[in-house]
Structure formats: C-alpha cells, structure tokens
Amino acid sequence: MTRAFNFSAGPATLPESVLRQAQAEMVEWNGVGASIVEISHRSADFMAVAAAAEADLRSLLSIPDDYAVMFTAGGATTIQALLPLNFAAPGQAADYVITGHWGKTAIKQASPYVDARIAADAETGGFLDIPPAASWTLSPHSAYVHITANETIHGVEFRDTPEVGTLPLFADFSSSIASEPLDISRYGLIYAGAQKNLGPVGISVVIVRRDLLERAGQPRADIFNYASHVARDSMLNTPPTWNWYLLGLTVKWMLEQGGVQEFARRNAEKAALVYGAIDGAGGFYRNLITPAVRSRMNIPFFLPDEQLDALFVSESKAAGLLALKGHKAVGGIRASLYNAMPLAGAQALANFMHDFQQRHG
C-alpha cells in the first residue's frame, strides 16, 4: 500500500526509512536474540543506544558542553508543571509570554507551584502576532521567562530569540526543534515533546544549563527532580526504551540528511509552497497571521465557510492528504510540515488547493 502524506500536528509523520528500519529490527535487534523493546534499559546494549542518541542530538543541535540533556517519559505538559518545581525558589515569580494555546497551557500547569505572571499576552489581538520583547513586563527577580517557540494551533512562531537580559529564557520547542539552526546558549532551558520532529509520542527532551540545576530548591519527590535525572543519565526509573530508540534513529536520519541547515532550507521551501497557495487564492483561503511571525511548521487557514472546510478535509483525504482538519479550538484547516514531510507532500497539497479552488471557488 502506498503511504499517504500525513499532515498531522502530532503524533506526526516519521521518515519512512526510520519506520522500515524499526520494522526490520522489531523482532530481533542487533544480533542479541531479542527485540529492542525486550532488553533491559541497563544492559550494555541499550546503554549504547541511549549514549548514541544523546551524542547525535548534541551534534545535530550543537549543544554546548555546559548543558545537560535529559530524555524524559511523557510530554511537554508534564515538563511545564515540573519547571517551577525545579527552578523557582519559594516565593519567587516566573514570567510567561502567551502567544497561543500552548502558552496558555504552560502557565496553567505552572500556576499551582509558582507566582506565574503574564509578561505579555497576544490573545487580545487574536494571537495574530507576537508582542515585541521590548514591550514585555518582566519581573526583575523572575526565576525564568517562558515562551512557546512555535504555536501549533494558532500558527505563530518566534523567528528570532527574544532578549530578556540576565533572566534565564525557557522555551517550549516541541514543534520546531531541529527545524533550523538554534543558538542554545541564549536559553537557560529548552524542551520538546518528541512527537513532531524528533520521533514518536511518549518521550521528551529537556536541555538545561547545568548551573540552573544547582541554584533553585528541589522537588520533594526525587522522580520530579531534574538534577536527579541528570545524575542518573535519564534512568532514574525505567525509561520508554522503544521511544528512545526511535528518537535515536530519527536524529541520526536528520544528521545523514544534512542537519539543521539542510532542514531549514527544506522547511522554508515547503512553507513557501503552501503560503503561496493561500496568498495567491484571492481570498478563497485565508491566513491572518502577521507574515513576519507565520509558522513554518504549522499553517492554519480557512475557507469561506465551514461547509467548504469539511469538504476540503474529505476530498483531501481521498486524494491521499491526511489529517488536514484544523484544531477544534479554532477550526478551519491546518497543515503541519515537520522535518519528515517531504517537499513532494507540500507540493501535492499546494496542487490540491489550487484544484479545489477551481472546482469550488
């Protein structure tokens, strides 16, 4: 059966070569006589898998030596609750910049554990733009400033790293990590659920400047303590080994493809095709996001009415273009163009958009 183009926002499309390698190695892996999902996470064989995944991720993202890397079970929402527990001292505030749905989720998760303050909120403008950093109201002694680098639902993306002075900048990079070069040294911490650009759902990556692990009060429960996870090489408890293995395969694939510089080029080309189809449609397709902050990863757009939205989703699925229905919070259509989406997928979508407009416009 021919694989369709999967535009799902997450879990998202994975490289076919990675899936086929995982398929081939599922029953018996690397000559050990058992599947990778059956061997001990503390065996020499799996420890080598884990070490290779970290080494390749460090190479892919140019992670400085003074930053620790954690591979954690669960997703970004869990991390959002753990950030204040690990990095905010009692009575200390933390600043949040709200640029979409996931920014709102981040502050909601943190609020029970820290004085979570809104430094800027783009909701008053309909989440169509990102307030400039110079306009943010930052607390001078804040534990950190939190941003969402790319909003998958509303389709806005920080195109430059904001300047926050000496305050640690924390960022949710779940949907844009490894999509272009990133100067990690400008951040105190970045994190990402794997299920968009790094691999399957169920595992996340946390990259943190080591000195930050030492300066704040620690959670009472060791399992929530990031310093403990770093000290135990992300194996404080049994990790999701299959997910970790697949993440490692995906990261290695990205390196083999040319790394983040190459994916930046590809992603710009893919986004240009879809935005070009929107902007050239004379209003039949609408994306209202300020062009300077349009997401390259997630492109939401709307047709003239909801009936056409539904017809677009139905006909596109029949044409082999999957998961284009917009998020329930906003409706419309959404195309996610993560690293594993080939240029041919973006071109097929742009062609379909033109054809659909010709027939229904």
Curated annotation (Swiss-Prot):
Gene3D superfamilies noted in UniProt: Aspartate Aminotransferase, domain 1, Type I PLP-dependent aspartate aminotransferase-like (Major domain)
Co-factor: note: Binds 1 pyridoxal phosphate per subunit.
A biological-process GO annotation: L-serine biosynthetic process
Keywords: Amino-acid biosynthesis, Aminotransferase, Cytoplasm, Pyridoxal phosphate, Pyridoxine biosynthesis, Serine biosynthesis, Transferase
Pfam family, one: Aminotran_5
Binding residue positions for L-glutamate: R42
Needed co-factor(s): pyridoxal 5'-phosphate
Catalytic activity, reaction form: O-phospho-L-serine + 2-oxoglutarate = 3-phosphooxypyruvate + L-glutamate; 4-(phosphooxy)-L-threonine + 2-oxoglutarate = (R)-3-hydroxy-2-oxo-4-phosphooxybutanoate + L-glutamate
Residues the record lists as binding pyridoxal 5'-phosphate: A76, T77, W102, T152, D172, Q195, N237, T238
Molecular function terms, GO-annotated: O-phospho-L-serine:2-oxoglutarate aminotransferase activity; pyridoxal phosphate binding
Pathway membership, UniProt: Amino-acid biosynthesis; L-serine biosynthesis; L-serine from 3-phospho-D-glycerate: step 2/3; Cofactor biosynthesis; pyridoxine 5'-phosphate biosynthesis; pyridoxine 5'-phosphate from D-erythrose 4-phosphate: step 3/5
Modified residue annotations for N6-(pyridoxal phosphate)lysine: K196
Assigned GO CC terms: cytoplasm
Documented EC number(s): 2.6.1.52
Domain of life: Bacteria
Intracellular or extracellular location(s): Cytoplasm
UniProt keyword Amino-acid biosynthesis, yes or no: yes
InterPro entries per record: Aminotrans_V_dom (IPR000192), Aminotrans_V_PyrdxlP_BS (IPR020578), Pser_aminoTfrase (IPR022278), PyrdxlP-dep_Trfase (IPR015424), PyrdxlP-dep_Trfase_major (IPR015421), PyrdxlP-dep_Trfase_small (IPR015422)
Major enzyme class: transferase
PANTHER family: PHOSPHOSERINE AMINOTRANSFERASE
Family classification: Belongs to the class-V pyridoxal-phosphate-dependent aminotransferase family. SerC subfamily.
Function per UniProt: Catalyzes the reversible conversion of 3-phosphohydroxypyruvate to phosphoserine and of 3-hydroxy-2-oxo-4-phosphonooxybutanoate to phosphohydroxythreonine.
Self-association and partners: Homodimer.
Name of protein: Phosphoserine aminotransferase
Source organism of the structure: Xanthomonas oryzae pv. oryzae (strain KACC10331 / KXO85)
Gene, per the UniProt record: serC
